[in-house]
């Protein structure tokens, strides 16, 4: 469960998130939609505990989130994620060693499906392949909350379809809260499930959504 209560985030005089109250109680794949600079990354980093908020509170599974928390129960990956210049297979191995719940079999299966060369160093991969490896590591973490920031960046149309299929398979295997941010509108993020109301929450498809009027950042519950 994720709970945000009157969350505001400011950088100096600039307000990026303003008075957001939101509760996500059920497992599902959720979409965070907004143009570049709308505050999507700030929203996800705040939930993950990667940065402190200005005012308000954020809780995940009843635990208050802050940058001081050692284990938030959240796995977050952003676009342009930077890893050590190590072979891809070594990155998967390290991830499994530091996380007892890590699903190494799932990660290996996805590596094979997307024909990723485990011997190739991460920094030598294309943007799309870097994003795919980062996403696989994130999903295989088996955390209760998965946050994916622009995961389809650098993907062509076919790869986007394959990505969402992988996401659905991961969710079926381990139901949890998965939030995917994007600026690309697709069938997975349909605007018909949301109505705009400035800085308020409202029921959408049995759940809730918000519209951040500061920058135009939309949150969609599953259909």
Language-model features, listed with the residues they occupy:
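Conserved structural motif at the start of ABC-family nucleotide-binding domains
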Residues: 2, 17-19
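Helical segment within the ABC ATPase nucleotide-binding domain
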Residues: 161-173
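Catalytic Walker B motif of ABC-type/P-loop ATPase nucleotide-binding domains
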Residues: 146-150, 155
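Helix-to-loop junction immediately C-terminal to a conserved catalytic motif
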Residues: 48
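Helix N-cap at the start of a conserved alpha-helix in ABC-type nucleotide-binding domains
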Residues: 157-159
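ABC-family P-loop ATPase nucleotide-binding domains
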Residues: 76-133
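Conserved ABC transporter NBD signature motif
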Residues: 56-69
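The feature captures the beta-strand-to-loop junction immediately N-terminal to the Walker
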Residues: 33-35
């Amino acid at each position: 469960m994720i709970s945000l209560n009157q969350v505001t985030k400011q950088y100096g005089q600039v307000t990026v998130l303003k008075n957001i109250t939101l509760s996500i109680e059920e497992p599902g794949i959720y979409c965070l939609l907004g143009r570049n600079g709308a505050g999507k990354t700030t929203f996800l980093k705040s939930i993950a505990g990667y940065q402190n908020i200005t005012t308000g509170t954020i809780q995940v599974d009843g635990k208050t989130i802050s940058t001081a928390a050692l284990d938030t129960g959240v796995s977050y990956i952003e676009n342009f994620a930077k890893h050590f210049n190590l072979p891809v297979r070594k990155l998967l191995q390290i991830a499994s060693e530091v996380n007892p719940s890590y699903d190494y079999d799932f990660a290996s299966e996805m590596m094979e499906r997307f024909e990723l060369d485990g011997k190739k160093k991460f920094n030598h991969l294309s943007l799309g392949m870097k994003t795919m490896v980062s996403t696989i590591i994130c999903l295989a973490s088996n955390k209760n909350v998965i946050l994916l920031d622009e995961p389809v960046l650098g993907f062509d149309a076919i790869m986007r379809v394959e990505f969402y299929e992988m996401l659905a398979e991961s969710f079926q295997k381990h139901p949890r809260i998965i939030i995917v941010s994007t600026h690309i509108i697709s069938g997975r993020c349909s605007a018909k499930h949301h109505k705009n109301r400035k800085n308020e929450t409202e029921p959408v498809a049995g759940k809730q959504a918000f519209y951040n009027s500061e920058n135009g950042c939309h949150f969609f519950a599953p259909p």
